[in-house]
Amino acid sequence: METDAVGVVCFNLGYLPGPTADKEVRTRRTTTVSAVASGVRVLRPGGVLTVVGYTGHEGGWEEVEAVMELVSSLDPREFTATNHSVVNRDNCPQLIAVHRKETK
């Protein structure tokens, strides 16, 4: 896929919920960071990328921290990166959003 092609990219990290879900089948830090980096590359100006990371399972915080490290390193002249969370509850999902600024 070429760069500047996509308006919205969404990631929902963790494992498939439900009583029969295999909690070993889940997203992993290394592949998630690679996928998010690819998503950022294909965002067109004005596009948005979101990542919802769940921190209540093994490896969840590490995965969110790795994504935060990646988006924190984006050029602020080209991107705005934010993190939203509920601060009065434990292990709440983190919503990370990246907006690629419009070109002038």
Can you describe what each PLM-predicted range is?
Residues 1-7:
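S-adenosyl-L-methionine
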Residues 7, 47, 79-82:
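Residue-level recognition of the N-termini of beta-strands and the immediately preceding loop/turn
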Residues 7-35:
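Mobile active-site "lid"/loop adjacent to the S-adenosyl-L-methionine
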Residues 15-16, 54-58:
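Short "lid" loop at the C-terminus of a central beta-strand within the Rossmann-like core
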Residues 34, 38, 66-69:
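Alpha-helical scaffolding segments of alpha/beta enzyme cores, especially the outer helices
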Residues 35, 41-53:
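Conserved beta-strand signature within the Rossmann-like core of class I S-adenosyl-L-methionine
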Residues 57-104:
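Class I S-adenosyl-L-methionine
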